[in-house]
Amino acid sequence: MLGGLVTALRTLTILPIPGKDAVTFSHSLYWFPFVGLLLGALLAALGYVGSLSGWHEFAALLVVLGGIVLTRGMHADGLADVADGFWGGRSKEAALRIMKDPTVGSFGALALSGVMLLKWVAVVRLLSFGLFDVVMAGILLARLVQVLLASALPYARREAGTASAFVAGAGAPHAFSALLFTLALLFPFYTENFPTMLWLLGAALVAGSMVGMVSYRKIGGVTGDVLGAGSELTEVAVWITGALLLSDYLLF
């Protein structure tokens, strides 16, 4: 069982983790929410330390860049590849071929720049109100969405790829367990503000569903790049939602 945790940590972070990987990589999906909580706590702590100076813009930049560093830029790279492939390839084969190209095209650069800017703007707002729990929640819910996408959709490539071993054995038990685990991890932070947790969860599920639907229509399933893009888009959706909940002009 702990092999799944080792695999999840090695896959999702740069942390040097001793131990043996899971024999079946899909077993690591059960641990994705826990790794999301760990990453979220580290980034929230980084944001807190940065905010002590009162310079929330710089603290937010630390959070955004810290997320890239701690994940080896893997999810950000996936977002860029998906943007290039989905909007640059007219057929499934063309999209998959473009996504495999290591260079970043114009669509990828625009998507990456836009998402990172939105993240930064949202995190500035969250940190200025001391909402470190929402920063953490975005990271945690993004890993839940990765499990849901891997469990709900088939692997899109004919040949094996980075995520094929995770997607191959994934199914409803992984999705259901990850959802329950995520709720259990989030609930202690929102016992006095349960509606906020529901809004954040809803934002994550909407973002994940949209990624899944677009990916299924475009390439017939998911790849590692799609899982990475789903993570990035979920983070920004949750953080933007959290920032909007602070607005005096919106009645939630």
Curated annotation (Swiss-Prot):
What the entry lists under Pfam families is as follows: CobS
Q: Which residues form a coiled coil?
A: none
Which controlled-vocabulary keywords does the entry list?
A: Cell inner membrane, Cell membrane, Cobalamin biosynthesis, Magnesium, Membrane, Transferase, Transmembrane, Transmembrane helix
The cofactor(s) it depends on are: Mg(2+)
- Please give the superkingdom of this protein's source: Bacteria
Q: Which reaction does it catalyse?
A: alpha-ribazole + adenosylcob(III)inamide-GDP = adenosylcob(III)alamin + GMP + H(+); alpha-ribazole 5'-phosphate + adenosylcob(III)inamide-GDP = adenosylcob(III)alamin 5'-phosphate + GMP + H(+)
Annotated TM spans: 29-49, 50-70, 104-124, 129-149, 166-186, 194-214
Q: Which GO terms describe its molecular function?
A: adenosylcobinamide-GDP ribazoletransferase activity; cobalamin 5'-phosphate synthase activity
Q: Does the keyword Transcription regulation apply?
A: no
What are the BP-aspect GO terms? cobalamin biosynthetic process
Q: What is its EC number?
A: 2.7.8.26
Q: Which InterPro entries match?
A: CobS
The pathway entry for this protein reads as: Cofactor biosynthesis; adenosylcobalamin biosynthesis; adenosylcobalamin from cob(II)yrinate a,c-diamide: step 7/7
> What family does the Swiss-Prot or TrEMBL record give for this protein?
Belongs to the CobS family.
UniProt cross-references to HAMAP family, sorted A to Z: CobS
Q: What does this protein do?
A: Joins adenosylcobinamide-GDP and alpha-ribazole to generate adenosylcobalamin (Ado-cobalamin). Also synthesizes adenosylcobalamin 5'-phosphate from adenosylcobinamide-GDP and alpha-ribazole 5'-phosphate.
Q: What is this protein called?
A: Adenosylcobinamide-GDP ribazoletransferase
